[in-house]
């Protein structure tokens, strides 16, 4: 089991923490990359996503501000 945790700040300044569970690492990575793509398209100012294994170890993590990512 793998978990994808998202932390995103919307345009109103509210922070949402979204957690989804996935059976395989491939499914989790697919969701992870979809989250990052959606954040880039929507212009969410701060976004973080992480894939965590069943044992609690981070597999993949990325956090950025769009102003920095656009450079």
Predicted features by range, described:
Residues 9-13, 24, 65:
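Compositionally biased, intrinsically disordered low-complexity regions
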Residues 6, 22, 58:
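Functionally constrained cores in energy, signaling, and assembly domains
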Residues 14-30:
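A short, exposed loop/beta-hairpin motif centered on an aromatic-Gly-Thr core
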Residues 37-71:
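Short, mixed-charge low-complexity intrinsically disordered segments
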Residues 11, 27, 56-58:
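Generic "edge-of-domain/loop-turn" microfeature
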Residues 1-18, 44-46:
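Short aromatic-glycine-(Arg/Gly/Cys) micro-motifs in beta-strand/loop hairpins
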Residues 31-36:
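Exposed aromatic-hydrophobic patches
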